[in-house]
Amino acid sequence: MLETRFRIRTPQRSLAFAVTTVTAAAATAFTLALAASTACAAAPVAYVTSEKAGVGVIDLDQMTLTKTFPVGADGPRGLSLNADGTRLLVASKNTGDLAVIDTASGQVVQRVKIGKNPEYVRVRNGYAYVTYEPGEEGGPPAANNAPNGKPGADDDDANKPPAEIAIVDMKTWRVIRSVTSGHETEGIEFSRDGHTMLVTNEGDDTVSVYHARTGAPVRTVKLAAGGRPRGIRLSPDGKDYIVTLESLSKFVVIDAHTFQVVKTVDTKLGPYGVAFGPDGKRLFVAAARDKTVQVFDGHSYEHLADVPVGQRCWHFSFTPDGAKLLVACGRSDAVYVLDAQNYQPIRQIGELPLAWGIVTYPHSDGSIESH
């Protein structure tokens, strides 16, 4: 009788154990699914560096400024996100470092010493590339982008030390090497395979080409004298680089294989930020001195449209869904929001004094980040 009862109860215990195990597994799966759902449901955001206020956080569903990370005293300028959006890397002009911000809390969790006047940041393949200028004084640009506000004044000095590019390992948060560049390095772009890095050098009218991982120089591309190259972006097919020439009010198309200039296109005054639209069919250029974003055909580079915006609009980003264009306008202390298809204004988001750069999460294309 005992043997019979034993045989009957064992399956029940096994069944109970199995049910408990399945229930626990189901609960775990449900919790993970709920967490994933919650993460997916979180509103997309834009991060905007304001040289006076800090880093503004914009809810892209509501198109409102929801908070500001209080790093304004650091003089934040260039910025870029890590792959999962948990860390925002900001070039801090006044402190000479790279501030690593936890995007959940808004707190600086790491500081990486860079050097004098860090400006531009790009993240690629687990490394952060940060430009800095040992020979420059920094500070917001004078009116008309000239010293003391005098149009046409020349602030270049060939005797100043050239710019440097610090390469930061994002696992250890250490500078693993620093690469000597040209004068007043402005923009950073990478080849399609990520093996080659190109930077624009405003002060000596060149584009420097390097091996991205080692920093070894490959070549220097000389552009038109006095052009002041600033923005740079790779075409979606990987065949060309677009470089804006601020002082000549043009952009050039550089063959990605030969590094020869194959086309020159006129723009309005003072072009800086440049990016292709998410579908690659249009090219957008921020003509900062003309208070205009210009639109060109992404293949022929034929001029398509001029879109009025605010003052000193250097950088911009599309929203993650590609529906809107967000333009950071520093002298208007605001982000201008435009419909990315018909270019109609939607709204202005203020309280961003000396807005400098803008990126989004989920990641989207723009004049700073390209995905």
What are these regions (language model features)?
Residues 16-37:
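Bacterial N-terminal signal peptides
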Residues 40-371:
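Predominantly soluble domains enriched in secretory-pathway, periplasmic, or organellar proteins
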